[in-house]
């Protein structure tokens, strides 16, 4: 931690207030069915409320500036055997205000020399990509209005939908077969429902009646074929009413397009590098201790960036983990920068909440 420099510029504060949700109802779960909802749903609500109780929760106003479409871009990390955590990252943003970001990213791609290379955590070892990360993250902070939310789940927890026994697996299998999705490995079914319930919760929290909802997920085991992906959207359409009765005008989605459409991939990449960096960092801390943790080159830029919200882009990371007494608990995760950046200014959180 270090002493922060605050600004009280009225124009900046007003700009921040326009794109920030000033009165958010964090009681997302409905009284009628909250007892029937899975543990994950309760952990999500508890996590957001815990962040709010700390006075640190900032949420985006996704209907500001006449935005009519909520874009959700999701990617996941921690699936390698060495990782001790699964991570699920979701960029929930004002889709209608992204044109300036797309224009600036096209320019950055040309200047940085990465051309048509996808920005991905697994490729941080490539010098040109690693060197352009700070500029990319600054553009995200400046031109994306939304929330980057990451859920971290301890791998010792087999399921967030039951005790993880045969009965839990059977219920998930039956639910998938009812939709025509087909049979999948239990780990894929668990992942699928974790992702869909997170999206439903976030849409219930941040979406407004009449808006369109567009979701893009990376090529992944939960939607390997176009037909599977279509059925995946159908399952989301069934899960969403468990969390909200808001009438949305459209619910659709896509996998990454062919040929590559970087105006979408550059948004998906933000979820990719957040999920990858957080999984790798927390695993290293858990294994070696905080002082000896080894952060992947490039990951240091992402961690530093995750420490603070920008005027338009908010960030929130929470965990569901095994407690020392064997129970499962949840709560926010804080990343704290140790050194300042030149010309760095902060708006007091209480002025925009």
What are these regions (language model features)?
Residues 2-71, 76-353:
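Phosphate-ester processing/binding pockets and catalytic centers
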